[in-house]
């Protein structure tokens, strides 16, 4: 019972000593522990968290872990208690063999501090191995002539334990002839020898049986036995003898197998068979047996297997020479293995912190490396460095450890993965090196906004597009990765024509494709300005803007619109008047059209599709002016029908047509007379209605002439000013601008003289419109003349049958305004497609007004005529406010004055010195009327 109680106390004493030793070593700067071998897994070794000054509960947070160079992890860290424990069963003999002290060095890594702490653990031997003989039965041959005191070596027992637990003693079973003597060698080994105490007599006893016991000093002690059979031989009194008791050999570790080391020779003075010697290894362990080979006949020793200095650098063995008489001779062989640089340095990545943020500070630890070379001396000295010009460097840590740190800031957009080559080279000759690749990933941060290739774009879309049609595709590039590079697109909200921009355009937030939500109309919207924003999904998100100009392209989707002549509302066709005295190139009327399209789609051309009298009229290709292609003849019909087409230049082209009816007559009464001379159908209702219309027209004409006479009387005091202008030959003297009104008022004045004869080509209805003149207030801006409202009287005429229904020509649409190029051209005195121009300065305006005043004043002269000659105010077609002075209707030559056989002629004819052409024509026609 005493032995079991003493063992726990001794264990406690050992742990106490180990703890005191640990504290002492900590004070010296290194942590040391000790632990007995063969302890169970998880056995306590030491409180490393306390020794490092760390809180056991925060070990995981600090990243504390055990690192060691060996492949087998012997120790582990208890994360709860912070204690160093065994990771498994530890066999001291396997780790350190026969070394007096078994020390295991490990390292403790504190990752958050980037530090390594060395820990030295001593494995304490326990008596867990029995002394063991290599054989269980041993045969010893002794010659009978052996003298007392002769010694015979016995096999040694091997105990892997050390200290007191190792082999301590041998015991021999009791007998009368032999005793046991134990010798202690230079290395501390004990060698048993069998000593002959009494002379042998083979004839008395030929064999002896002994038992040899080997015991260690453990508690309790362990032992093993071997049986010894002693055979007494006949006389052979000389044993083999080696010339040297010890042989020493040095050999390089890279010597190939079969290399001869040396040859040993033992001499035996006996003759014959008793002098023949056989050689063999006597003391050799299991590891040495396959490495060396001994020729038993010659004594030659050679290498049987490649040597390795790193495994074992020194070998000790005994060579035994034995003759046939069982006489033995012994010698020792000591082999020293010399190191050669045959091992490359080994680099082990202990810890790698990947990925690393691209904004990490310089000096950030990337990895811990362990470098080791199994060679010795300079062959085992290693230098470590990195290849290429990379932003990393190696720093020396404790022992053979290095840490890889950054030298500067990283940029993932330039390099996202670094292949770091770590070179480890020894100092041997020649030096050996090792390359180790470390793949380091750089983690992205959101440091780049999305960017467009261009700051602005222009896109085009045809009008009348389909809803949902794709317009344009935008792409922004973000050099970041993952969510930092996920780009979303948006359009900044705005208003367009009072509506939100999002009702016209939408953008796919993922692809950046723009879509049209509405069908665009070029005539309403011609361009849109968009601000597109590209944002990434980082935290915080980054964005950039780009301006997009979206232009709507015109299509030929609008046909030309005819503004003049305006289409009547009753279905009738307006009648344009042309005097029979008109020469070639006389401007009859002008077709005015516009196209709401633009560009080529709005270029208009005019052409004559159909005419009742081919070759009589022509239409200007670009102006739309209807002119006489030749002089009018008496044989030409009174009513001419023209169909004019207006066509744009789109693809395909669109067109519109208008039908014009031209009445060929020198005066309005002549028109009425000739219209009345047509044979209408007999209808009593139509005849009475025609009579009423004729009377109404005559009455209105009289009132109009009376109003003109009164107006001319009021303007008589300015007559001398007008005559001065005429006598100067067309050159105007300075007339104050304040006496005249602008161009728009001149147009209004011209409108007061508008006369429209609407003759329906396809019906028997027509009506003649006489506007009441109101030019007094139009021309005088400073005089207090009374302003008269214009009176418009409409009279219908029946051509063939009297019908109850009648219509009135609608005036032109006043909503439209003409540009300078769209205004009607000059009078019939001009030829071709030339267009007239509006007065563009004050002098031209005053001159125009003076001519109007002069013409009006000449009407008061009874001897003067108002015939429509060239350059006079001849009768033109449908005069609106857009016509120039040359289109003012010459109402004087078309009005018959009762009680006088003279007709009013244009005073301009007198000034020009020309005979009034229109006057002669009127006289002839008057004669015809008298005959009728």
From Swiss-Prot:
Residues 30-692 are extracellular. Keywords: Calcium, Cell adhesion, Cell membrane, Glycoprotein, Membrane, Repeat, Signal, Transmembrane, Transmembrane helix. The chain crosses the membrane at residues 693-713. Residues 714-932 are cytoplasmic. One of its GO terms (cellular component) is plasma membrane. Residues 1-29 form the signal peptide. It comes from the Eukaryota. InterPro entries: Cadherin-like_dom, Cadherin-like_sf, Cadherin_C, Cadherin_CBD, Cadherin_CS, Cadherin_N, Protocadherin/Cadherin-CA. Residues 810-841 have a biased composition (Polar residues). It is a single-pass type I membrane protein. Residues 30-133, 134-242, 243-347, 348-452, 453-562, 570-682 form the Cadherin domain. Glycans are attached at residues 47, 414, 419, 545, 685. GO terms for biological process: cell adhesion; homophilic cell adhesion via plasma membrane adhesion molecules; nervous system development. Residues 922-932 have a biased composition (Basic residues). The keyword DNA repair does not apply. It is found in: Cell membrane. GO terms for molecular function: calcium ion binding. Residues 804-841, 902-932 are annotated as: Disordered. Potential calcium-dependent cell-adhesion protein. May be involved in the establishment and maintenance of specific neuronal connections in the brain. This is Protocadherin gamma-A8. The lineage of its organism: Eukaryota, Metazoa, Chordata, Craniata, Vertebrata. The gene is PCDHGA8.
